[in-house]
């Protein structure tokens, strides 16, 4: 059951969102990388690669993503589509990043290469299969699993799919200094699902938006439904309020 929020909580969350959803937010955030490249297909590809390593230490994943951007020469979409990544991500068991070895990341990029070669862009792939965020997540998890990639993209939409939810926010929210909104014409922002980052979960409990700290897809959807009381038609504006405050604390 979705809790009814007091007006004071609604006002506080709206104020926090306005404070944190600024251009400054991208500094030290994985969303920064998609703003460093040009062209819709390239921004989309850069964003998808950036989300794939966006966990653990910010210093570490920002550095790893920068190395991938440098290797691509600023053209991530072509770099993947042409298979140039094999030169720096060989299929061996050496560590690539934290829990990922080279073989895992190579298979992830190879599956993405297949998608690009078959469909042109990820947006073109999803717009024929998705009308909301959940169906987009289901299509992506299914495609990567079916094409031999495991351990980076979740195998289904039962987990929180935190990074995919963040990626879909980037792609689907228009009119934002942070998010690009490239897919706003086929994924309505009202359908986006809250990325269940540890900061978001903690602040949600503090504000009484969640009763416990367990993170599942059903929990993420309940939190999103609650945020619709605060931001009608744009629940993930609340992501900036909760995440921004959590990082600041």
Where are the model-predicted features located?
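HhH-family (HhH-GPD) DNA N-glycosylase catalytic core used in base-excision repair
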Residues: 1-249
């Amino acid at each position: 059951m979705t809790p009814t929020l007091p007006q004071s909580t609604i006002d506080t969350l709206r104020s926090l969102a306005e404070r944190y959803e600024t251009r400054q937010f991208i500094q030290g955030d994985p969303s920064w990388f998609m703003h460093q490249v040009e062209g819709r297909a390239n921004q989309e590809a850069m964003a998808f690669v950036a989300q794939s390593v966006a966990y653990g230490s910010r210093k570490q994943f920002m550095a790893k993503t920068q190395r991938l951007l440098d290797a691509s020469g600023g053209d991530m979409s072509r770099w993947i589509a042409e298979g140039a990544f094999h030169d720096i991500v060989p299929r061996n068991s050496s560590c690539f990043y934290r829990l990922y070895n080279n073989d895992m990341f190579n298979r992830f990029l190879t599956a993405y290469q297949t998608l690009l070669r078959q469909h042109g862009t990820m947006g073109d792939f999803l717009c024929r299969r998705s009308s909301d965020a959940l169906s987009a997540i289901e299509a992506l998890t299914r495609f990567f699993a079916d094409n031999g990639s495991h351990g980076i993209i979740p195998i289904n939409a039962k987990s929180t799919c935190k990074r995919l939810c963040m990626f879909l926010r980037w792609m689907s929210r228009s009119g934002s200094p942070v998010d690009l909104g490239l897919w706003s014409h086929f994924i309505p922002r009202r359908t986006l699902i809250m990325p269940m980052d540890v900061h978001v979960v903690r602040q949600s409990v503090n504000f009484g938006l969640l009763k416990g700290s367990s993170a599942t897809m059903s929990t993420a959807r309940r939190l999103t439904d609650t945020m619709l009381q605060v931001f009608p038609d744009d629940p993930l504006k609340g992501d900036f309020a909760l995440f921004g405050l959590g990082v600041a604390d």
